[in-house]
Amino acid sequence: MTETAPVRRVAVALFEGFTVLDVYGPVQAFASSRIVGPDGKRQPLFEIFSMAGEAGRVKAGEGPASWAEWSFEKAPDYDILLIPGGFGTRAAVADQAFVERLATASRRARITTTVCTGSALLARTGLLDGRPATSNKIAWDWVVQQGPRVLWKRKARWVDDGDVLTSSGVSAGIDMALSLIARLHGRDMARTAARNMEYVWHEGADDDPFA
Protein backbone atom coordinates (compact mmCIF):
# COMPACT_ATOMS: atom_id res chain seq x y z
CA MET A 1 0.00 0.00 0.00
CA THR A 2 1.33 3.43 -0.93
CA GLU A 3 0.78 6.61 1.02
CA THR A 4 1.27 10.34 0.76
CA ALA A 5 2.09 12.64 3.65
CA PRO A 6 3.56 16.12 4.06
CA VAL A 7 7.29 16.33 4.64
CA ARG A 8 8.03 18.48 7.69
CA ARG A 9 11.30 20.32 8.14
CA VAL A 10 13.22 19.95 11.38
CA ALA A 11 15.82 22.60 12.23
CA VAL A 12 18.45 21.63 14.80
CA ALA A 13 19.93 24.55 16.76
CA LEU A 14 23.61 23.95 17.50
CA PHE A 15 25.93 25.77 19.89
CA GLU A 16 29.38 25.10 21.30
CA GLY A 17 29.24 22.35 23.92
CA PHE A 18 25.94 20.73 22.91
CA THR A 19 25.43 17.07 23.87
CA VAL A 20 25.77 14.68 20.95
CA LEU A 21 22.89 12.33 21.83
CA ASP A 22 20.57 15.28 22.52
CA VAL A 23 20.85 16.05 18.81
CA TYR A 24 21.40 12.75 17.07
CA GLY A 25 18.99 10.64 19.13
CA PRO A 26 15.92 12.65 18.03
CA VAL A 27 17.43 13.14 14.56
CA GLN A 28 17.66 9.36 14.13
CA ALA A 29 14.06 8.95 15.28
CA PHE A 30 12.84 11.50 12.73
CA ALA A 31 15.04 10.00 10.01
CA SER A 32 13.70 6.50 10.78
CA SER A 33 10.14 7.61 9.97
CA ARG A 34 9.40 6.77 6.36
CA ILE A 35 6.48 5.74 4.17
CA VAL A 36 6.22 3.99 0.82
CA GLY A 37 5.35 6.66 -1.72
CA PRO A 38 3.29 6.38 -4.93
CA ASP A 39 6.47 5.51 -6.83
CA GLY A 40 7.07 2.52 -4.58
CA LYS A 41 10.11 4.08 -2.95
CA ARG A 42 10.52 4.76 0.75
CA GLN A 43 10.11 8.46 1.39
CA PRO A 44 11.09 10.43 4.51
CA LEU A 45 8.47 12.17 6.61
CA PHE A 46 11.01 14.68 7.92
CA GLU A 47 13.72 16.77 6.29
CA ILE A 48 16.43 17.69 8.79
CA PHE A 49 19.06 20.42 8.74
CA SER A 50 21.31 22.16 11.26
CA MET A 51 21.86 25.82 12.06
CA ALA A 52 23.81 27.91 14.56
CA GLY A 53 24.74 31.49 15.29
CA GLU A 54 27.00 31.24 12.26
CA ALA A 55 27.20 28.50 9.65
CA GLY A 56 30.20 26.23 10.05
CA ARG A 57 31.91 23.94 12.52
CA VAL A 58 30.35 23.53 15.97
CA LYS A 59 32.10 21.39 18.58
CA ALA A 60 30.09 19.12 20.87
CA GLY A 61 30.81 18.83 24.57
CA GLU A 62 31.92 15.24 24.07
CA GLY A 63 34.50 16.25 21.45
CA PRO A 64 33.22 15.52 17.93
CA ALA A 65 32.31 18.51 15.80
CA SER A 66 29.19 18.91 13.69
CA TRP A 67 28.56 21.24 10.79
CA ALA A 68 25.89 23.93 10.98
CA GLU A 69 24.56 24.26 7.44
CA TRP A 70 22.92 27.63 8.06
CA SER A 71 23.02 30.62 10.34
CA PHE A 72 19.81 31.23 12.28
CA GLU A 73 18.94 34.20 10.09
CA LYS A 74 19.58 32.53 6.73
CA ALA A 75 18.01 29.15 7.49
CA PRO A 76 15.09 28.13 5.28
CA ASP A 77 11.59 27.83 6.72
CA TYR A 78 10.97 24.93 9.07
CA ASP A 79 8.15 23.35 11.04
CA ILE A 80 9.97 21.94 14.07
CA LEU A 81 12.84 23.41 16.07
CA LEU A 82 15.06 21.08 18.13
CA ILE A 83 17.10 22.68 20.93
CA PRO A 84 19.61 20.31 22.58
CA GLY A 85 21.23 20.65 25.96
CA GLY A 86 24.78 20.11 27.10
CA PHE A 87 27.43 21.75 29.25
CA GLY A 88 27.55 24.53 26.70
CA THR A 89 24.18 25.76 27.93
CA ARG A 90 25.93 27.29 30.96
CA ALA A 91 27.66 29.81 28.72
CA ALA A 92 24.79 30.11 26.24
CA VAL A 93 22.21 31.25 28.82
CA ALA A 94 24.48 34.20 29.63
CA ASP A 95 24.83 35.19 25.97
CA GLN A 96 21.88 37.56 25.55
CA ALA A 97 22.40 37.92 21.80
CA PHE A 98 22.24 34.14 21.40
CA VAL A 99 19.16 33.90 23.62
CA GLU A 100 17.38 36.53 21.52
CA ARG A 101 18.26 34.75 18.30
CA LEU A 102 17.00 31.49 19.78
CA ALA A 103 13.72 33.20 20.71
CA THR A 104 13.32 34.37 17.13
CA ALA A 105 14.12 30.86 15.88
CA SER A 106 11.45 29.41 18.17
CA ARG A 107 8.84 31.87 16.96
CA ARG A 108 9.52 30.77 13.39
CA ALA A 109 8.66 27.16 14.25
CA ARG A 110 5.23 25.63 14.52
CA ILE A 111 6.58 23.29 17.20
CA THR A 112 9.61 23.83 19.45
CA THR A 113 11.26 20.88 21.18
CA THR A 114 14.03 20.81 23.77
CA VAL A 115 16.20 18.02 25.12
CA CYS A 116 17.83 17.96 28.55
CA THR A 117 19.13 21.42 29.59
CA GLY A 118 17.94 22.83 26.28
CA SER A 119 14.83 23.78 28.26
CA ALA A 120 17.01 26.16 30.28
CA LEU A 121 17.84 27.99 27.07
CA LEU A 122 14.20 28.21 26.05
CA ALA A 123 13.29 29.31 29.57
CA ARG A 124 15.73 32.21 29.29
CA THR A 125 13.84 33.49 26.25
CA GLY A 126 10.68 33.85 28.35
CA LEU A 127 8.75 31.65 25.93
CA LEU A 128 8.23 28.99 28.62
CA ASP A 129 6.77 31.39 31.19
CA GLY A 130 3.52 30.01 32.59
CA ARG A 131 3.93 26.73 30.73
CA PRO A 132 4.74 23.21 31.99
CA ALA A 133 8.20 21.89 31.16
CA THR A 134 10.82 19.41 32.31
CA SER A 135 14.57 18.92 32.06
CA ASN A 136 17.58 16.88 33.11
CA LYS A 137 17.27 15.74 36.74
CA ILE A 138 20.98 15.94 37.56
CA ALA A 139 21.06 19.60 36.52
CA TRP A 140 17.56 20.29 37.84
CA ASP A 141 18.35 22.96 40.43
CA TRP A 142 20.36 25.00 37.93
CA VAL A 143 17.78 24.66 35.19
CA VAL A 144 14.82 25.87 37.24
CA GLN A 145 16.77 28.99 38.19
CA GLN A 146 16.83 29.95 34.51
CA GLY A 147 13.04 30.18 34.40
CA PRO A 148 11.38 30.97 37.73
CA ARG A 149 8.02 31.56 35.99
CA VAL A 150 8.06 28.18 34.26
CA LEU A 151 5.78 25.46 35.65
CA TRP A 152 8.56 22.93 36.07
CA LYS A 153 7.51 19.28 36.27
CA ARG A 154 10.19 17.10 37.82
CA LYS A 155 8.64 13.66 37.26
CA ALA A 156 8.28 13.52 33.50
CA ARG A 157 10.12 11.76 30.72
CA TRP A 158 8.81 14.55 28.52
CA VAL A 159 6.10 17.21 28.64
CA ASP A 160 3.87 17.91 25.65
CA ASP A 161 2.28 21.35 25.82
CA GLY A 162 1.04 21.53 22.27
CA ASP A 163 3.45 23.69 20.32
CA VAL A 164 6.24 23.16 22.86
CA LEU A 165 7.67 19.81 23.95
CA THR A 166 10.43 19.49 26.55
CA SER A 167 12.22 16.32 27.58
CA SER A 168 14.28 15.09 30.48
CA GLY A 169 17.95 14.15 30.24
CA VAL A 170 19.79 13.10 27.09
CA SER A 171 18.16 9.83 25.91
CA ALA A 172 14.71 11.13 26.86
CA GLY A 173 14.87 13.24 23.71
CA ILE A 174 14.40 10.07 21.67
CA ASP A 175 11.19 9.25 23.55
CA MET A 176 9.95 12.80 23.07
CA ALA A 177 10.71 12.72 19.34
CA LEU A 178 8.87 9.41 18.98
CA SER A 179 5.88 10.87 20.82
CA LEU A 180 5.81 13.76 18.36
CA ILE A 181 6.02 11.33 15.45
CA ALA A 182 3.07 9.47 16.99
CA ARG A 183 1.08 12.69 17.24
CA LEU A 184 1.78 13.71 13.66
CA HIS A 185 1.73 10.32 11.92
CA GLY A 186 0.20 7.80 14.33
CA ARG A 187 1.51 5.51 17.03
CA ASP A 188 2.19 2.69 14.59
CA MET A 189 4.61 4.91 12.68
CA ALA A 190 6.40 5.85 15.90
CA ARG A 191 6.67 2.21 16.93
CA THR A 192 8.01 1.33 13.49
CA ALA A 193 10.63 4.08 13.79
CA ALA A 194 11.63 2.76 17.22
CA ARG A 195 11.86 -0.77 15.86
CA ASN A 196 14.00 0.44 12.96
CA MET A 197 16.36 1.93 15.56
CA GLU A 198 16.20 -1.22 17.74
CA TYR A 199 15.16 1.12 20.53
CA VAL A 200 12.74 0.40 23.39
CA TRP A 201 10.44 3.41 23.45
CA HIS A 202 9.18 4.71 26.81
CA GLU A 203 5.67 5.45 25.55
CA GLY A 204 4.41 7.10 28.73
CA ALA A 205 5.32 10.75 29.23
CA ASP A 206 5.31 10.25 33.01
CA ASP A 207 7.36 7.05 32.84
CA ASP A 208 10.46 8.67 34.34
CA PRO A 209 12.69 6.27 36.32
CA PHE A 210 15.23 9.04 36.98
CA ALA A 211 12.95 11.49 38.80
Can you say where each PLM-predicted feature lies in the sequence?
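Extended, subdomain-level signal for the structured scaffold at the beginning of enzyme domains
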Residues: 1-112, 120-124, 141-146, 152-155, ...
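Residues that mark the start of a beta-strand
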Residues: 7-9, 132, 163
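Short, well-ordered alpha-helix to beta-strand connector turns
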Residues: 78, 109, 130-131, 161
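Short, glycine-/small-residue-rich phosphate/pyrophosphate-handling segment
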Residues: 127-145
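FMN-binding flavodoxin-like domain, especially the glycine-rich phosphate-binding loop
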Residues: 134, 154-159
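A short glycine-threonine-serine/GTX helix/turn-capping micro-motif
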Residues: 163-169
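Divalent-metal (often Zn2+) His-rich catalytic cores of metallo-beta-lactamase-fold enzymes
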Residues: 172
